[in-house]
From Swiss-Prot:
This is Short-chain-enoyl-CoA hydratase. Belongs to the enoyl-CoA hydratase/isomerase family. GO terms for molecular function: lyase activity. Keywords: Fatty acid metabolism, Lipid metabolism, Lyase. The lineage of its organism: Bacteria, Bacillati, Bacillota, Clostridia, Eubacteriales.
Amino acid sequence: MELNNVILEKEGKVAVVTINRPKALNALNSDTLKEMDYVIGEIENDSEVLAVILTGAGEKSFVAGADISEMKEMNTIEGRKFGILGNKVFRRLELLEKPVIAAVNGFALGGGCEIAMSCDIRIASSNARFGQPEVGLGITPGFGGTQRLSRLVGMGMAKQLIFTAQNIKADEALRIGLVNKVVEPSELMNTAKEIANKIVSNAPVAVKLSKQAINRGMQCDIDTALAFESEAFGECFSTEDQKDAMTAFIEKRKIEGFKNR
């Protein structure tokens, strides 16, 4: 697939995905969503990639939202299809077995906030702005905002942000738990890469199963979640990485890399 709006790069075991529509503040149109879907598939099938960083081109905007110029003439059926496409792509990103870090530079509004929330970890530049302003445009959040925001910041705060169409600064996003860390713009990508490299230095199977267990637990009762955790925990003992790491620990030496098996 020819990529016009998304850039995929690899730096060792880390994939860097850049949404590249700076003239449109990296707004998400249908073509960009389809390219994102393709890129996620490429990452899924690349065994060398163990972590992902998602960012936006330029310093002004991570993703300013869904593309209003495309949406304004949509009818009910077209709007529903657009929402289904966005939700499909964001859910696929969320379920990717490899941890995904959002490096949020500038505006993360509407679909931009929603795609950031689909990532596992969110690092924001100090000039970042977050919000779900859709009701001010006569629509609801359509790419998961009504569901993921409340899971991250609580129902009351999610309702306040969505009902008021209020945008918040990075430090407020940190305070309410929407982002993990705020750094200066010049340090954003370095910080994201530092975290990604810490992740890929650990046992990949254990990281993958930990992500699955956390995600599963958010969608079911505690007993079902704990049963899944026990299965994941047990599965780790079938891996070479577990044997090698525990042997190295007992022998008081550092393990010389994991094999991802």
